[in-house]
Amino acid sequence: MMLVELLSGVISCVCALLAVAFFTLLERKGLGYFQLRKGPNKVGLMGLPQPLADAVKLFTEELVKPTLVNVFPFLVCPAMSLFLALVLWILYNNYFVCSMGGLSMLLFLCVSSLGVYSVMGAGWFSNSKYALLGSVRAVAQSISYEVSMSLILMSCLLLVGSMSLSMIMKYQFFVWVAFVNFFMMLMWFVSCVAETHRAPFDFAEGESELVSGFNTEYGGVGFALLFMAEYGNILFMSVLVISLFFGGVVFVGVFGMGLCVMVSFVGWLFIWVRASYPRYRYDLLMYLIWKSYLPSVLSILMFLVVSVYILNG
């Protein structure tokens, strides 16, 4: 049984990495068409092998270690970031979800909150002012929006009465939580965009102020691992949006095609938002969470608590 669980987890991680590779191609092609150009189309048929060519290029580059970095933690942080991103995908390993019982969402909260340490370490151990300031911005942004994400998640758990992801999905077989909690769903999506440091909330970097942010000193393998972790988190958040608000179990169907279509649409929304909206201001981003989202989420959560208490007698 343990071997089956282990193999199932490994397969989940490998599939996630393959999805990340082709999601980067989708983003580059999509942004190209948004900007009235073709995007990558020279490698193979319509540019489809482009992610494989990029992987070969990045992983065969020389490992450059800047003079002032703390070498060991500098090299460990990207690997730690990717490891944490892949651990989240174990939630969608059927055997592991069953063995976790009612604690799968608790695992999500714990692992997702650990991601800020790898980002902070990547900037801190680079011993670069640009990288350090970028990591401080990224950590402040992540911690702020984790507050709203946790409270929104609590509202979903309150409606279902369980911390099990499989129970949340089964609960929505007849009615989606998105219909009951539509504004929470919108706030969750915006929080996911901010949590993954995506445009228009990409304040961890900035060409005119922070260069590339916390990954300024990374090249080759380190750069690849950091961005694989970022895109892995984007895809995981897309799956989680469908599971929490649109009853992911309903779409499983034949070979899970319905679920794949819905997740692809949410992933495309991340790209669409990046292509459509200008960069936000950092102070307005913080005002959005602390002065708008937090009071709204707390009010809705209190309303749900009172409603559930009254309905349960």
UniProtKB/Swiss-Prot annotation:
Function comment: Core subunit of the mitochondrial membrane respiratory chain NADH dehydrogenase (Complex I) that is believed to belong to the minimal assembly required for catalysis. Complex I functions in the transfer of electrons from NADH to the respiratory chain. The immediate electron acceptor for the enzyme is believed to be ubiquinone.
Keywords, comma-separated and alphabetical: Electron transport, Membrane, Mitochondrion, Mitochondrion inner membrane, NAD, Respiratory chain, Translocase, Transmembrane, Transmembrane helix, Transport, Ubiquinone
GO molecular function terms noted in the UniProt entry: NADH dehydrogenase (ubiquinone) activity
GO cellular component terms given for this protein: mitochondrial inner membrane
Listed transmembrane segments: 6-26, 71-91, 105-125, 149-169, 173-193, 220-242, 255-275, 293-313
The protein's name in its UniProt record: NADH-ubiquinone oxidoreductase chain 1
Protein topology in the membrane: Multi-pass membrane protein
InterPro entries, per the entry: NADH_UbQ_OxRdtase_su1/FPO, NADH_UbQ_OxRdtase_su1_CS
EC number(s) per entry: 7.1.1.2
Enzyme class: translocase
Database matches in PANTHER family: NADH DEHYDROGENASE SUBUNIT 1 (PTHR11432), NADH-UBIQUINONE OXIDOREDUCTASE CHAIN 1 (PTHR11432:SF3)
Gene of this entry: ND1
Family to which the UniProt record says this protein belongs: Belongs to the complex I subunit 1 family.
Example of a GO biological process term: aerobic respiration
Compartments it resides in: Mitochondrion inner membrane
